[in-house]
From Swiss-Prot:
Gene3D superfamilies: 3.30.230.10, 3.30.70.240, Elongation Factor G (Translational Gtpase), domain 3 (3.30.70.870), P-loop containing nucleotide triphosphate hydrolases (3.40.50.300), Translation factors (2.40.30.10). It is found in: Mitochondrion. It comes from Drosophila erecta. Pfam families: EF-G_D2, EFG_C, EFG_III, GTP_EFTU. GTP binds at residues 40-47, 104-108, 158-161. GO terms for cellular component: mitochondrion. The gene is mRRF2. This is Ribosome-releasing factor 2, mitochondrial. One of its GO terms (biological process) is ribosome disassembly. CDD domains: EFG_III, EFG_mtEFG_C. It comes from the Eukaryota. Residues 31-310 form the tr-type G domain.
Length: 718
């Protein structure tokens, strides 16, 4: 190839060599990038861990503390007031000749959608465990999300300085509750002064951090022959044995080596990297972020064991030299307007570039920024594999795929292939929202529109019956944060109505009816006659009755008309007849339809919707209420009082398990309607000694008494 290039002349040869060197540089640059997310249960120490990473990487000059409200990644007023992460935030920092793009994600169940979108942008994750609690409810949730995205993982067992921390139990939880294969690279030990130190399994050394310089430096000392060294050598041998069963290259060396002691450390680390990126094992490290122990070695492990961008996302190779980028978050900046966070999957994004969303909308990138939470450094171009903030994108929404390709036929394919539309969980609560005055209505609608671009789990709808704007959200905290953000960011003091439970409805029995409607609109005759049936079915929402007597009629309907009938019919399922809940477990079956010439699609759609509403009233519906799964940890002497209170709340006790020496954990399912203010009640019953986590776990039928009570609540009579 080089010979051919020279034959075509020196100018072409120089261009070819420049292109080759440019490709090599880009590949080398990409290999040094690590895009990672930090996942955990609430209060496990994600944000503190992130703040330490920024400090030791030289990005910040002082340690950010959650309890002081001076963290970089928790920059929203609501986050600093409450001491929790609400929105995912992106930060970029250098570490040992690598560039780490890190996303700090929320731990609260109300903000699970934030985590889901962030995982589209990363190549690996660090899961932080609370060393005193092990695997908790939200840990299981975020782990399953990482499973869905097939992401390699590291475990960081935090808070190991605490006297009640239990490293062995945490590792056991990983095996039992997450069904994964952990490999321990470190073990905790106490120094002579009682401070937490770490024994390194691979290098057979002890790591001790210096608190005088806030943990910036640490000593690594080779262990002298002792019981500690013998135990650590056994752990190293177990690690080699475990990895050799998963990695052929290491297995060949082990077979030809006299002793495990002679297996080279670098060989072990390469085998561990291969096993981790292939998701065969999960390396486990430990430390204490608050006490400044173990963070540098965690960052080393991110560089060593988690994959580079080029090792994943090969599916996007089909874009060739075109740009492909995934929008994983949108934030609103007072000075710069909407800012779009994009993970660049292929190509290079430059300032002023024209991009097309997979929805077919053209956008122009006015400016590019490198992310550091709510601070930004302007750049001119960003390479494949990196994360960038784009300014000037006006119609792009979270979850969009951006590309420089303008081929129309590629839009539909990318929608199918790359799952553009995010899977938004059902709302758990809803409430009305009112502006402080009529003049503020437009400003409120604009604020809600912007918040929806940022947060797809926020539902905004208009109730034609009451004439109110209705919000749907993932929980009480979610709704409270939305109100607070509208006030602090948009200066609108909105009023939220009382929170209502998001009940669902299901039909009691099948029903069949025919609806014929004729009307003259603007001199044009509109006529529709339609026969529909509703039946119990959890599979398809809409189907055709292809029986011999109906098939000839259905064959005369054009595909566009069938689509209009389908859309109108399904829209009626959004509001059931009893409490306005979504109708589920129901299928609409079209038997036949006759559409008059010149009848507008909107008239056909409205008739189909009216027909379904008539059917729902005829068949009757039953209510389904949301059920929550709770994990309650409390001292053993408080358990009886807590369980007595739960029984009054229609709760189902699934299990009571020991949790340490003094505590027990109650696993329980309870209706959401019975849990209003439960966290306060639990504090009272347990005298502040109990803790609780809660997450949705489906819907359940109700008896007639509870249904009547739910209807009265929905009507504002309770």
């Amino acid at each position: 190839m080089l010979k051919c290039a020279w034959q075509n002349g020196p100018r072409q040869s120089n261009r070819w060599l420049w292109q080759l060197s440019n490709q090599i540089w880009k590949r080398s640059y990409s290999s040094k990038i690590r895009n990672i997310g930090i996942l955990a249960h609430i209060d496990a120490g994600k944000t503190t861990t992130t703040e330490r990473m920024l400090f030791y990487a030289g990005k910040t000059r002082a340690l950010g503390e959650v309890h002081r409200g001076n963290t970089v990644t928790d920059y929203l007023t609501q986050e600093r007031e409450r001491g929790i992460t609400i929105c995912s935030s992106a930060v970029t920092f250098p570490w040992n000749d690598h560039r780490i793009n890190l996303l700090d994600t929320p731990g609260h169940i109300d903000f699970t959608m934030e985590v889901e979108q962030s995982l589209y942008a990363v190549d690996g994750v660090v899961v932080v465990l609370d060393g005193t609690a092990g695997v908790e409810a939200q840990t299981v949730t975020v782990w399953s999300q990482a499973d869905k995205h097939k992401l390699p993982r590291l475990i960081f067992v935090n808070k190991m300085d605490r006297p009640d921390a239990d490293f062995v139990k945490c590792v056991s939880d990983l095996k039992d509750k997450l069904e994964t294969q952990p490999v321990c690279l470190q073990y905790p030990v106490k120094n002579e002064d009682g401070q937490l130190a770490i024994n390194d399994v691979i290098h057979l050394e002890r790591l001790s951090w210096q608190q005088k310089d806030l943990g910036r430096s640490y000593k690594n000392v080779k262990l002298e022959p002792s019981d500690d060294l013998r135990q650590l050598q056994e752990k190293r041998n177990e690690l080699i044995d475990q990895l050799s069963g998963l990695d052929d290259e290491l297995a060949d060396v082990v077979i030809s080596t006299e002793s495990f002691d002679k297996v080279d450390n670098a060989l072990i680390e390469r085998a561990l990297r291969r096993a981790t990126t292939q998701q065969k094992v999960v390396p486990v490290l430990l430390g204490s972020a608050y006490k400044n122990v173990g963070i540098q070695r965690l960052m080393d492990a991110v560089n060593s064991y988690l994959p580079a961008p080029e090792e994943r996302n090969q599916i996007y190779d089909c874009f060739g030299t075109e740009v492909a980028g995934k929008v994983f978050k949108i934030v609103h900046d007072k000075q710069r307007g909407p800012l779009t966070l994009v993970r660049i999957l292929r190509g290079e994004i430059k300032r002023g570039m024209r991009l097309i969303s997979a929805r077919g909308q053209a956008e122009v990138v006015s400016k590019l920024y490198e992310p550091l939470a709510d601070e930004y450094r302007e750049v001119s171009a960003v390479q494949s594999g990196d994360v960038v903030i784009c300014a000037g994108l006006k119609s792009t929404v979270t979850g969009d795929l951006l590309t420089s390709s303008e081929e129309d036929d590629e839009f539909d394919e990318s929608h199918e292939l790359f799952a553009i539309d995010p899977q938004i969980p059902d709302a758990v609560y809803f409430c009305s929202i009112e502006p402080p005055s009529v003049s503020s209505q437009t400003a409120m609608e604009q604020a809600l529109k912007q918040l929806q671009r940022e947060d797809p789990s926020l539902r905004v709808s208009y109730d034609s019956v009451t004439g109110q704007t209705v919000l749907g959200g993932m929980g009480e905290l979610h709704m409270d944060i939305i109100k607070s953000r509208i006030l602090s960011e948009y200066k609108i003091d909105v009023d939220l109505g009382p929170l209502q439970i998001a009940y669902k409805e299901a039909i009691e029995s099948p029903a069949l009816t025919t609806l014929s409607v004729e009307k003259e609109i603007a001199g044009s005759k509109q006529s529709v006659s339609i026969t529909l049936e509703v039946v119990k079915n959890q599979a398809e929402l809409f189907s055709l009755d292809k029986s011999p007597e109906n098939l000839p009629n259905l064959n005369t309907l054009r595909p566009r008309i069938l689509q209009v009938l389908r859309k109108g019919s399904i829209s009626a399922l959004e509001r059931g007849p009893r409490v306005g809940g979504q109708v589920v477990e129901t299928q609409i079956r079209l038997h036949n339809a006759t559409i008059g010439r010149g009848t507008a699609d909107s008239f056909v759609m409205a008739t189909a919707s009216q027909c379904v509403q008539k059917l729902l009233s005829t068949s009757g519906t039953r209510l389904l209420e949301p059920i929550m799964a709770l994990q309650i940890v409390a001292p053993s002497e408080r358990i009886s009082g807590i369980m007595a209170d739960l029984s009054r709340r229609r709760a189902l006790i699934n299990d009571v398990l020991p949790k340490g020496e003094r505590n027990k954990m109650i696993l329980v399912n309870a209706p959401l309607a019975e849990l209003s203010g439960y966290s306060s009640a639990l504090r009272t019953i347990s005298s502040g000694t109990a803790s609780m986590t809660m997450q949705p776990c489906g819907f359940s039928s109700m008896n007639s008494v509870d249904e009547s009570l739910a209807e009265r609540r929905a009507q504002g009579l309770e």
